[in-house]
A protein has these predicted regions:
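Hydrophobic alpha-helical transmembrane segments
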Residues: 97-104, 130-178, 353-377
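Interhelical loop/hinge segments that connect adjacent transmembrane helices in multipass membrane
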Residues: 127-132, 154-161, 167-209, 380-382
Length: 382
């Protein structure tokens, strides 16, 4: 997963350096739509991985049920996002309806990838999971970068991203058919219910973690939204890098009867975050090089705030996965309250670049603290 995140980060650098701030701001908002739309894939991944982890004797049947669901969910998500172009295009100040349609096209293979990842994760097939994640990162950096090199526009970048999104599906193609010949059967109802609950929580989280890119595109002028997007490169790096912890420890969190696994995981993610913030604060000019160079020089003194916001969101991400592993779906209420708080501050107080990133950092830190100290919910039967 680290390799995937490095590749995705590399694409962000290529895009920041190749596109003018106006175009890069639009691309960042579109990538935010993909991340939010990808919650169905993550919900399917979490539900599949958890079911296999707690019911290993029913692995064959669970994989069969997942396979039957995947194409339906993929087609539904892709179509819904594509149709949303009529609302999102004017909201994000885009010049064409096609970029959002291409977001929908990208989400079809990404949803299939989610099912494949859940099977690999639940069965501890780490090599297969690594191949899938690397395929996602390589597909993004090669497809997106090649498209930008041919024609440096948002439309071109999204075409490359949509094509590259099929590479991880090819890498994990055998997983969905792994046990399709087994005659055992498990009802899809329980899997669907768990996937919906997981998707709801992940939707709330990804709205929280991506809403600032959409707010910046909607509220700021196109130049300032591009500046904010450059800072988000660093925020996403701080957010995505430690996510391998959530993936690796999720089966342990699902089976654990104590909080030791949770404590170890949170400590590790928080430690990565502190290193990221310290490094950015001490070496801001080096960080500037990593987010696009001198044309974003106005952001130099504020980059550490983006590292802080991303690090806080990384801890929240882990705590969300911990809650899903424990079937503690009540966390979704706190996530939506956090979303409402950020939106209220952004639009009610009329914040600028600094105010928006500080709002994200503060709300995420408070949310992580509340979730950590909240009484643990009892596990539901699997």
């Amino acid at each position: 997963m680290v390799g995937m995140n490095i590749a995705v980060y590399a694409f962000s650098i290529v895009a920041a350096r190749s596109l003018i701030p106006r175009e890069f701001g639009a691309l960042t908002a579109l990538l935010g739509i993909i991340l939010v739309g990808n919650v169905a894939a993550l919900g399917l991944q979490v539900a599949t991985a958890r079911r296999i982890a707690v019911e290993p004797d029913r692995t064959n049947e669970i994989i069969g049920a997942t396979t039957r669901l995947t194409l339906l969910i993929a087609a539904s998500v892709g179509s819904a996002v594509a149709l949303a172009t009529f609302a999102l295009t004017p909201l994000l100040k885009l010049e064409s309806y096609w970029p959002v349609v291409l977001c929908g096209a990208t989400l079809v293979p990404l949803t299939v990838m989610g099912a494949q990842s859940g099977i690999a994760q639940g069965t501890a097939r780490w090599r297969s999971l690594t191949a899938i994640y690397l395929g996602n990162g390589i597909g993004r950096v090669i497809g997106g970068s090649a498209a930008i090199a041919i024609h440096p526009t948002v439309n071109s970048a999204m075409i490359g991203i949509a094509i590259g999104a099929w590479l991880p599906v090819l890498a994990g193609a055998r997983l969905l058919a792994l046990h399709s010949s087994v005659h055992g059967f498990v009802s899809r109802r329980g899997l669907v219910r768990e996937a919906i609950l997981g998707t709801h929580a992940l939707l709330a989280y990804f709205v929280l973690s991506n809403m600032d890119s959409l707010i910046a595109r909607n509220r700021f002028d196109v130049h300032d939204s591009g500046l904010y997007a450059s800072g988000l490169i660093l925020a996403k790096a701080a957010l995505f890098f430690p996510q391998f912890v959530s993936v690796v420890v999720f089966p342990d969190l699902a089976r654990a009867n104590s909080h030791h696994a949770r404590l170890r995981a949170v400590s590790l993610v928080a430690g990565f975050g502190m290193l990221a913030v310290a490094a950015t604060a001490i070496l801001p000019k080096v960080a500037l090089i990593l987010v696009g160079g001198n044309k974003y020089a106005d952001m130099t003194s504020r980059l550490w705030l983006f590292a802080l916001a991303g690090s806080a969101l990384a801890v929240v991400h882990l705590l969300v996965f911990d809650a899903l592993a424990r079937h503690a779906h009540g966390i979704v209420i706190l996530l939506w309250l956090a979303v409402a708080t950020v939106a209220g501050c952004a639009y009610g107080l009329g914040v600028g670049i600094t105010g928006l990133v500080v709002t994200i950092a503060a709300v995420s830190t408070i949310l992580a603290t509340i979730v950590w100290f909240a009484p643990a919910e009892s596990r539901s039967p699997s």
